[in-house]
């Protein structure tokens, strides 16, 4: 099922745009869950960082681990560089987030739905 970004809140759209920027900055063609989670954590006035801090999580450790995992992902040079597509894992997370949205009877997919889907 194609992802309907018109059903995303502004913050959720920004998270995907930021995730894409993270991937492109590292010459990575495949957009992964790690890119999205890092984007959610780094989001200005976002819920994810606040939630992790309230849970007592080591946020700097999580960010460091995400950066490390992202650095291990394949890089693309030359032809094809600059094009990004969603991995199967990330597509599954997006679909799970839409399921959460429907379960909660929300009209738009938010960062909360994405975070619930990632955590699941």
Feature map (PLM): residue ranges:
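Histone-fold recognition with a strong bias for associated Lys/Arg-rich disordered tails
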Residues: 1-120
């Amino acid at each position: 099922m194609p992802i309907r970004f018109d059903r995303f809140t502004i913050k959720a759209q920004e998270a995907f745009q930021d995730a894409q920027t993270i991937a492109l900055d590292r010459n990575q063609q495949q957009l992964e869950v790690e890119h999205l989670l890092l984007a959610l954590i780094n989001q200005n006035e976002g819920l994810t960082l606040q939630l992790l801090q309230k849970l007592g999580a080591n946020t700097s450790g999580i960010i460091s681990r995400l950066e490390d995992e992202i650095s291990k992902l394949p890089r693309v040079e030359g032809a094809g560089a600059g094009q990004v597509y969603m991995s199967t894992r990330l597509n599954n997370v997006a679909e799970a987030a839409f399921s959460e949205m429907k379960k909660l009877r929300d009209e738009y997919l938010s960062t909360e739905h994405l975070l619930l889907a990632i955590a699941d």
